[in-house]
Design a protein with these regions (language model features):
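Conserved positions within compact, well-structured domain cores
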Residues: 1-131
C-alpha cells in the first residue's frame, strides 16, 4: 500500500478519486492493476510495430485479438524521455525500501518487456481498460 497525504492507499483501480481513467472516462473505465499487466506480459505476444507512422508495440492475446500500444516515452517537466519506449502506469503503488514510494509501470523497450517502478513525478501513458 501507499501512504498518500497520511491516507493508506492500496491499489486504486476504479477509484475516481485517484484513478485518472475512471475520473476522466467514467465508472466503466479504470487503470489496469500490476497483476493485469503481469498477466499480459506472461500470456500475450509483444512485438515492435508501427501504426499510422507511430512506433509502438502490437500486443496479441492467445485468442488472436490484439491492441496497439504507442511508444510515447515519459515526460518530466517539458522534457520527453525514452521516446519510442512504452511506459504504462498501473493503479498499483509500491514502496521501494531505498527511495520511498513509486508507481508500478509496464516498460516496453525493443524486445525487453517488464514491470518496473516509475517516479511519481514522471508522466507516463495510461491505457484504460473496461470490463
Amino acid at each position: 500500500t501507499y501512504l498518500y497525504y497520511n491516507v493508506d492507499l492500496p491499489d486504486f483501480s476504479g477509484d475516481p478519486q485517484y484513478d485518472v481513467a475512471s475520473a476522466k472516462w467514467g465508472a466503466d473505465w479504470r487503470m489496469p492493476t500490476r497483476a493485469e499487466y503481469e498477466e499480459l506480459l506472461e500470456y500475450c505476444t509483444l512485438e515492435q510495430a508501427t501504426l499510422n507512422n507511430v512506433s509502438g508495440y502490437k500486443v496479441t492475446g492467445q485468442n488472436g485479438n490484439h491492441i496497439f500500444l504507442p511508444g510515447a516515452g515519459t515526460i518530466c517537466g517539458t522534457n520527453i524521455n525514452f521516446e519510442g519506449d512504452g511506459y504504462y502506469l498501473t493503479s498499483t503503488p509500491e514502496l521501494e525500501e531505498w527511495d520511498g514510494y513509486y508507481m508500478c509501470s509496464m516498460h516496453l523497450s525493443g524486445t525487453l518487456f517488464r514491470i518496473l517502478y516509475c517516479e511519481k513525478s514522471y508522466g507516463s501513458s495510461v491505457r484504460p481498460v473496461t470490463e
